[in-house]
Amino acid sequence: MADTDDIIDYESDDLTEYEDDEEEEEDGESLETSDIDPKSSYKIVESASTHIEDAHSNLKHIGNHISALKRRYTRRISLFEIAGIIAESYNLLQRGRLPLVSEFSDETMKQNMLHVIIQEIEEGSCPIVIEKNGELLSVNDFDKDGLKFHLDYIIKIWKLQKRY
């Protein structure tokens, strides 16, 4: 039993010393010497939400700019795409599709199919639709200057090969 009393006394002595240390620390530190700044030095920032909104609007602006570039790029036709349109149109004309030209007559049916296809494309009545950047586009959706440039190039090649 005597041992138990010693343990209790020992524990109670430590507690009082610990409490004394806390009191000394509280008395020794003031707000001026503390690591924590006083509340008066804190700045209330009201513009934090505006910074977030500005960043969000900036991202939205960048997204709109990318979409505009993508739309402009989509409107440019490549030589590969125009060759695909011509090939598909030729294939459908061979399978019996009627030419969609403004002056359709018996003479049109006697013309070379390549002439009919080029006439359809130049008039904008070619029924072939291609998918580019997730959009379905007809010949009318593309840049007219680029389309004309590629058609002229293809026609020159056909003339050299004596097909046109």
From Swiss-Prot:
Coiled coil: none annotated. InterPro entries: DNA-dir_RNA_Pol_19kDa_poxvir, RPB6/omega-like_sf. It catalyses: RNA(n) + a ribonucleoside 5'-triphosphate = RNA(n+1) + diphosphate. Part of the DNA-dependent RNA polymerase which catalyzes the transcription of viral DNA into RNA using the four ribonucleoside triphosphates as substrates. Responsible for the transcription of early, intermediate and late genes. DNA-dependent RNA polymerase associates with the early transcription factor (ETF), itself composed of OPG118 and OPG133, thereby allowing the early genes transcription. Late transcription, and probably also intermediate transcription, require newly synthesized RNA polymerase. GO terms for molecular function: DNA binding; DNA-directed RNA polymerase activity. The DNA-dependent RNA polymerase used for intermediate and late genes expression consists of eight subunits Rpo30/OPG66, Rpo7/OPG90, Rpo22/OPG103, Rpo147/OPG105, Rpo18/OPG119, Rpo19/OPG131, Rpo132/OPG151 and Rpo35/OPG156. The same holoenzyme, with the addition of the transcription-specificity factor OPG109, is used for early gene expression. It comes from Vaccinia virus (strain Ankara) (VACV). This is DNA-directed RNA polymerase 19 kDa subunit. Keywords: DNA-directed RNA polymerase, Early protein, Nucleotidyltransferase, Transcription, Transferase, Virion. It is found in: Virion. It comes from the Viruses. GO terms for biological process: DNA-templated transcription. The gene is OPG131. The keyword Transferase applies. GO terms for cellular component: DNA-directed RNA polymerase complex; virion component. Residues 1-35 have a biased composition (Acidic residues). Residues 1-39 are annotated as: Disordered.
